Amino acid sequence: MAIRTFRPYTPGTRTRVVTDFNEVTGRKPERSLVVAKHRRKGRNNRGVITCRHRGGGHKRLYRIVDFRRNKHGIPAKVAAIHYDPHRNAHLALLFYTDGEKRYILAPNGIAIGQQLISGPESPIETGNALPLSAIPLGSSVHNVELYAGRGGQMARTAGSSAQVMAKEGDYVALKLPSTEVRLVRHECYATLGEVGNSEVRNTSLGKAGRRRWLGRRPQVRGSVMNPCDHPHGGGEGRAPIGRSGPVTPWGKPALGLKTRKRNKPSNRFVLRKRRRTSKRSRGGRDS
């Protein structure tokens, strides 16, 4: 999939970069795999805002995606590639030989009419789902299960993949997209290949209105608020923060604070921690 740039006819097209969607073949989603989804708009059950800067956006229908790939031994044909408004990755519509239809994450390089299958005896081909014990070392996988039978939970975003590093006993070592190396049970399933639509990381919205279409509301800097609204607020003119470092609206450290519990039981499965991103790459926005 290629990216498309625009001439600066308007301020919104000057920096606009989008994907050309030439992989998407189906215009309308499969009716049997679509459900209505209530949009919470960042509110909890009491109507209180628990996640700021959420609301509005285009109305969506949720596509039911098969993350388990539990139809073992039943071949399926790729009928179409569909757009999904809830994620950057595209969806592949599968027609199984027993008549059932399912959506899966579309792997990179998949083609219309290609035959896919899941199970421990499946061939080593892109799009097939196998247990980690049956996948060769060095292979790239996505939609990796963390617990057997629960469905894929890791490496699901567009262009992402995990790498099978080693096998020892009942566990397989995976290098995740975050560079973390983690042990996963060998009976957990994963799909061969990487998730498609990897060019989405090179896109640019170009204007604030396109962000509103996605359901993202404006984000106001804390330094321009009053001191009753944010710890960064107050002062005369453009005053500094007045603290040793930036904090959240609730007074907690905003950058560099570790949020993982020290004594979490699953820490023993993490062989190497992820590489910490710098403040420059994270973007130290005054929230």
From Swiss-Prot:
Keyword Nucleus belongs to the record? no
Q: What biological-process terms (Gene Ontology) are attached?
A: translation
One GO CC annotation: large ribosomal subunit
SUPFAM superfamilies for the chain? Nucleic acid-binding proteins, Translation proteins SH3-like domain
Basic residues composition-biased segments: 258-287
This protein's record includes keyword Transmembrane: no
Named from the GO MF annotations, one term is: transferase activity
Keyword list (alphabetical) reads: Ribonucleoprotein, Ribosomal protein, RNA-binding, rRNA-binding
User: What are the boundaries of the region Disordered?
Assistant: 221-287
Q: Which InterPro entries match?
A: NA-bd_OB-fold, Rib_uL2_dom2, Ribosomal_uL2, Ribosomal_uL2_bac/org-type, Ribosomal_uL2_C, Ribosomal_uL2_CS, Ribosomal_uL2_dom3, Ribosomal_uL2_RNA-bd_dom
Complexes and interactors: Part of the 50S ribosomal subunit. Forms a bridge to the 30S subunit in the 70S ribosome.
The entry's family comment says: Belongs to the universal ribosomal protein uL2 family.
Q: What does this protein do?
A: One of the primary rRNA binding proteins. Required for association of the 30S and 50S subunits to form the 70S ribosome, for tRNA binding and peptide bond formation. It has been suggested to have peptidyltransferase activity; this is somewhat controversial. Makes several contacts with the 16S rRNA in the 70S ribosome.
Cross-referenced HAMAP family, in alphabetical order? Ribosomal_uL2_B (MF_01320_B)
For this entry, the protein name equals: Large ribosomal subunit protein uL2
Native organism: Prochlorococcus marinus (strain MIT 9303)
